[in-house]
């Protein structure tokens, strides 16, 4: 299934994901729960102190300045200073803990996502494109980090300030305080309208980001092909089209979200005008006498509270906008975290593989439940431990699909597959895969020294064991020619070694596992025939008890096998030794003759 097809499945499962969104993401807090709790506490302290300041200021004006009392000025001045300093300290600590909580949450979230991906089966991985997973690990996590930091700080501060400031303003003037309440439904209606319209746009943006990352990943992996075919301009144009799509969607979202600020400012200006007008009328009516009505100090406090309430509303609108953006990211991250691997350990797994025998019993296999036709159809096969089995067949005959079932990279759809006389689904996955070494078609080396790469097969391998494995894989010769020998640094993807050298290093890495089953999936295609023969001879002489399955395009690579399978369209159409198949299988004979061309016919066909 392609990366884009995950969108349909995601849409169908969104209601369930939304119900468990907070619960799923909350598991990633762990050791950062403490700063996540401390942040709101210090925010509340900061907010309450800031709200006390206008009341203290009103007393300072009315009792100190208007009343011409120096002791009152000193008293309320010191209280004002103490409130300001304590508020500053609380704000600093709130910011510090919010940063720790946000960054820690993001770190754990990335780790949890990556760990989840590592536990995926190939079926799970096929649902997501590389670019999609990269976006979810980077852009989406960053969006959630920013939103979380804002929620635990501004999301707590704003409502506290709004509620407490309104209570204080109500104590001063109930009629004027109602002005603030009138703004709330206007803002709520406007913000909800923006959210409903913009959320689908941001979802579309992040899916487009997936495509952009796919283009970059594909281009960098195939950069040599791009340059050899001078297709740079084509790739630039393709990248530009997707980038333009992101630009258009973001511009559309920004245009809509830009109404947020004007709406907020209209509420601010209208509120200030009404407060000033109503306050001035009451001051004039009372003659600035606190006993008769509003005073100048009270009006100053009301204006300050008005600004605090409206600033709190602006904070809430910022948090709201960030939540709209991050909701799409949260849903995409939860798609990964809630994805259940299709290949899991049984309740009481078997911890030992007896031998390298393999038995396919009426095995059918589909990559997807939606597939009309099975990839493998009614496979019946018995391989004794220690046998060498060759597999040949045309492109698309499901040779690789067959062998990928042995280490449970995929599970069979129907039937059963046994290794060592036990169904593979009963084994502990790690134990099974440690005993089945597989060299895939695409040979991958990682950044690091040759020795580091080889120790992927056995982290505790000694230098002697590494060299012995390389000798069997015919890799020791060219390694010794490097100036740094086994300490030679391999560039990312193994770009500084040839295809044949890369294949031999991967074979050596597999041999270091000392497996009971060794699978070579067309893993000597870049090796010359002489070296290929030396590798097979080394296998025959040095690891006779290991079951060896060799997929190859060259008949020469498999003709000495104990049994050769001929596959076509997911079925085993013939099996036998090289000589038997030459006599009985037209397809095998055709492949052999096309490769030997003008060579004389074998003795057995005369």
For each feature predicted by the language model, list its residue ranges.
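An intracellular "coupling" helix at the cytosolic face of ABC transporter transmembrane type-1 domains
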Residues: 31-34, 119-123, 139-152, 156, ...
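Transmembrane helices of ABC transporter permease
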Residues: 31, 35-48, 59, 89, ...
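Juxtamembrane helix-loop junctions of ABC transporter transmembrane domains
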Residues: 14-18, 41-42, 49-62, 83-130, ...
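Short intracellular "coupling" helices and adjacent cytoplasmic loop segments at the cytosolic face
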Residues: 4-16, 67, 103, 111-135, ...
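ABC-type nucleotide-binding domain
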Residues: 351-606
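Helix-loop-helix
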Residues: 69-78, 164, 168-182, 252-331, ...
């Amino acid at each position: 299934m392609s990366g884009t097809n995950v969108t349909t499945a995601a849409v169908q499962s969104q209601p369930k994901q939304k119900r468990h969104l907070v619960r799923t993401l909350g598991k990633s807090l762990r050791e950062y729960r403490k700063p996540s709790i401390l942040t709101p506490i210090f925010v509340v302290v900061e907010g309450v102190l800031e709200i006390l300041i206008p009341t203290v200021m009103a007393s300072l004006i009315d009792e100190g300045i208007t009343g011409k009392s120096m002791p009152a000025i000193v008293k309320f001045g010191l209280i004002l200073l103490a409130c300001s300093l304590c508020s500053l300290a609380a704000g600093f600590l709130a910011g510090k803990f919010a940063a720790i909580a946000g960054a820690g949450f993001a770190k754990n979230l990335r780790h949890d996502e990556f760990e989840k991906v590592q536990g995926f089966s190939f079926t799970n991985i096929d649902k997501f494109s590389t670019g999609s997973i990269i976006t979810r690990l980077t852009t989406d996590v960053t969006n959630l980090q920013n939103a979380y930091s804002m929620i635990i700080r501004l999301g707590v501060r704003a409502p506290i300030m709004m509620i407490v400031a309104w209570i204080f303003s109500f104590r001063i003037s109930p009629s004027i305080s109602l002005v603030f309440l009138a703004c709330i439904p206007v803002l709520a209606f406007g913000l909800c309208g923006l959210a409903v319209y913009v959320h689908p746009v941001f979802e579309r943006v992040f899916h487009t980001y997936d495509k952009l990352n796919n283009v970059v990943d594909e281009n960098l992996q195939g950069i040599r092909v791009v340059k050899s075919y001078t297709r740079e301009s084509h790739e630039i144009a393709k990248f530009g089209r997707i980038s333009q799509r992101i630009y258009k969607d973001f511009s559309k979202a920004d245009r809509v979200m830009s109404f947020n600020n004007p709406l907020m400012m209209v509420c601010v200006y209208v509120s200030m005008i009404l407060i000033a007008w109503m306050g001035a009328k009451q001051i004039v009516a009372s003659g600035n006498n606190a006993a008769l009505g509003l005073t100048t100090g009270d009006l100053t406090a009301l204006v300050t509270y008005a600004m605090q309430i409206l600033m709190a509303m602006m904070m809430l609108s910022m948090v709201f906008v960030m939540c709209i953006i991050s909701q799409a990211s949260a849903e995409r991250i939860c798609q990964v975290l809630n994805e259940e691997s299709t290949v899991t350990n049984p309740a009481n797994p078997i911890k030992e593989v007896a031998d390298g025998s393999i038995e396919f019993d009426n095995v059918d296999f589909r990559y997807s439940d939606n597939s009309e036709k099975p990839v493998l159809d009614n496979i019946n096969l018995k391989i004794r431990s220690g046998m060498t089995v060759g597999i040949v067949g045309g492109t698309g005959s499901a040779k690789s699909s067959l062998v990928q079932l042995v280490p449970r990279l995929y599970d069979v759809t129907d039937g059963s597959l046994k290794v060592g006389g036990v169904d593979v689904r009963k084994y502990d996955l790690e134990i099974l895969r440690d005993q089945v070494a597989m060299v895939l078609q695409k040979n991958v080396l990682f950044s690091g020294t040759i020795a580091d790469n080889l120790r992927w097969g056995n982290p505790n391998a000694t230098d002697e064991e590494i060299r012995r494995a390389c000798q069997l894989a015919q890799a020791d010769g060219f390694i010794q020619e490097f100036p740094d020998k086994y300490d030679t640094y391999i560039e990312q993807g193994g770009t500084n070694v040839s295809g044949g050298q890369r294949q031999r290093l991967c074979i050596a890495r597999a041999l270091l596992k000392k497996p009971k089953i060794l699978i070579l999936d067309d893993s000597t295609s870049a090796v010359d025939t002489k070296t290929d023969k030396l590798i097979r001879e080394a296998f025959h002489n040095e690891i006779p008890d290991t079951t060896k399955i060799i997929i190859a395009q060259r008949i020469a690579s498999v003709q000495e096998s104990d049994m050769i399978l001929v596959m076509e369209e997911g079925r085993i159409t013939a099996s036998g030794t090289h000589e038997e198949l030459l006599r009985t299988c037209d397809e095998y004979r055709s492949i052999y003759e096309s490769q030997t061309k003008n060579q004389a016919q074998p003795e057995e066909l005369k």
